[in-house]
Amino acid sequence: MKVYRLDKFIVPHNSRQEFLAKVNEIHTVLRSQAGFVQDFLLEQPLNDEAFNLVTLIEWEDASYIDAARSAVMTLHKNSGFNPQDAMARLGIKADMGTYKSINS
């Protein structure tokens, strides 16, 4: 059964460039992982200070998620990147989770 990783971020406009660069770097790694089907990076204006960014990744099934997570953790470790510290520094709020289709 296909599964979906859906992450929603509230991103201050002044953090946009740095955050999108990191998101694109992560998605480049994810696109090369076994079980990857497709992804979407979506944005929505929120107000004068921030916008919503939603990332959606479709996986063949849940068995591929741990390997993909490990690949991203390796990327972070090799580059010295700490996601929690970066999100705090950039003022980004996140709501992240893995979902399955109701109609499957």
Where are these regions (language model features)?
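Short, well-ordered beta-strand segments in beta-rich or mixed alpha/beta enzyme
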Residues: K2-I10, L41-V72
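Absolute protein N-terminus
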Residues: M1-K2, S104
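Short, surface-exposed ligand-recognition loops at beta-strand->loop->(often short) alpha-helix junctions
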Residues: I10-L20
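Short structured motifs
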Residues: N24, Q38-L41
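A general secondary-structure junction signal
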Residues: E43, T98-K100
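An amphipathic, aromatic/His-enriched active-site/gating alpha helix that lines ligand/cofactor pockets
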Residues: L30-V37, E58-D95, I102
